C-alpha cells in the first residue's frame, strides 16, 4: 500500500474557503495578516457569505510576493477569540487571482488589506478577449472603475496605451455641464442699452427654427462691476469660457444656445477660433488643449465681454492697422456695445451684489 500523499501547495496566490466559520471578516483578516511566512504577503481579500441554511462561511484570496510553499494543512487555521474552536479551510493554489477576486467580490461583504497584484497569466490578465474587457469597462459607469478593470484584465493595453485609453474614457463618460443658475433675474437689469436689448430680443425671442443660420454675435466692452457678466449669463443655457478656451466635454456642451466669452484676450482669440466663435460657424474642430480634435457643433452666437484698455479691449485691438482685415470681417458678424453705465440701477439686488 503506497504511503499517503503528503500535503503540499506551492503558489503565489492562495484561495481559502472556511465552511461554517463564525468569525467576522475583520477578525479573520487580522489573524491572517499576523501569520508568519518566509514570503511576504502582498494582498488579502476576504468575503463573508451565508449559506441557504444561514450558516456563515469565508472565502479568502491571499497573494504573496513570490511562490509560497505550504506543507502544513493546518497552517491557515483560524481560532475563535471567544470559545475553544478552530476553523480549518480548504486550501488551493489560485491559477487566476483575478477570477478568485471577482468571485469573492460578487456578494460585496468584503474586507481587504494591501494592494491587489495583477497576474498576467490569469484569464483576466491576458487570455480574456479584449472585447469582453472593454465591454465590461464601458458598463463600469465611471472613468476610474473602467480603468481599474482594464488595468486588471488588459494590463498590456493599460501600460502601453494608458494616455489614449484615459482620454477616450474621459470623453465617453463625460457628463453634460450642470446648467448655470443665474443669481439675478433679467428683470434686475433695467438699464440695458437699447441696441443690446434688441440683439437679445431678436435672438432669444424666436424659436430655434426661426433664427438665422449664422446669427450675429455681441461684443460688450465696459468697466468692471457694470453687470455685463451677470446679464450675459442670465439669458439662457450657455457655455462660459473665461480667461481661455476649453472645449473639454466636461465643461463645454454642444447643446446650448450661445457662448459667453469673458476676459479672453483678443490676441489669444485671434490665434485660436475668432471666426468660428464670433461667426457662429458650424461643424468645426478644435484641439486647443493639444489633445485629440474636438468636434464643435457651432451655429450659435457668442457674447464677448471685455474691459477697456490695451490688451483687453477688442475695439482697440481691431483698430490696429495689422488687424484691418479682421476688423472688417468682425463688423459684418458682430455688434459692438460700449457701456457707459451699469446695466442695473443702484439699490436693486443686482446693484448691491454685482461683483464683476
From Swiss-Prot:
Q: Which PROSITE patterns match?
A: CRESS_DNA_REP
Positions occupied by motif RCR-3: 103-106
- Region Binding to RBR1: what ranges? 143-153
The record's EC number reads: 2.7.7.-, 3.1.21.-
Its cofactor is: Mg(2+); Mn(2+)
Give the residue ranges of motif RCR-1.
Answer: 15-18
The answer to whether keyword Cell wall biogenesis/degradation applies is: no
Q: What is the free-text note on the cofactor?
A: Divalent metal cations, possibly Mg(2+) or Mn(2+).
In the UniProt record, which is one GO cellular component term?
host cell nucleus
List the active-site residues. 103
Localization: Host nucleus
User: Primary place of residence?
Assistant: host cell
Q: Which family does it belong to?
A: Belongs to the geminiviridae Rep protein family.
The domain comment in this protein's record states:
There are 3 rolling circle replication (RCR) motifs. RCR-2 is probably involved in metal coordination. RCR-3 is required for phosphodiester bond cleavage for initiation of RCR.
Protein name in the entry: Replication-associated protein
Species for this entry:
Abutilon mosaic virus (isolate West India)
